[in-house]
């Protein structure tokens, strides 16, 4: 039924202008606006929609993962742009917030609304 449908995901934010600045300027993503919705244009022709929600509650899980060739370099660049990395109990993270346990190297951070994002080495 949906084999030829170009599905997309979406998530909420309380302030679309603030989200546009963060995703466009801080993260460097291409963005556009469609009917008061923020569209994030991701690599590979994928789009994600950010919609306004006044009674917003941040996601308690990772909503977007950004695969990178060098997670340490990405963390350093994001830190220089004012991004702060999260620390989670039960995960042994280094001084930069990078988890170097099982699986790929990964570091989590939040957008201005408190939604969880991650960079992971691929």
Where are the model-predicted features located?
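Short, charged/polar surface micro-motifs in flexible loops or helix N-caps
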Residues: 45-47, 56-58, 69-73
């Amino acid at each position: 039924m949906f084999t030829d449908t170009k599905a997309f995901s979406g998530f909420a934010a309380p302030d679309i202008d603030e989200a546009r600045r963060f995703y466009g300027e801080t993260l460097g993503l291409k963005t556009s606006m469609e009917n008061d919705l923020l569209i994030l244009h991701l690599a590979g022709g994928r789009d994600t929609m950010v919609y306004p929600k006044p009674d917003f509650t941040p996601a308690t899980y990772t909503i977007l993962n950004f695969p990178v060739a060098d997670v340490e370099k990405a963390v350093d660049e994001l830190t220089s742009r004012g991004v702060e990395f999260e620390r989670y109990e039960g995960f042994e993270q280094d001084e930069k917030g990078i988890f170097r346990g099982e699986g790929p190297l990964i570091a989590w951070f939040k957008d201005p609304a408190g939604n969880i994002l991650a960079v992971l080495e691929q």
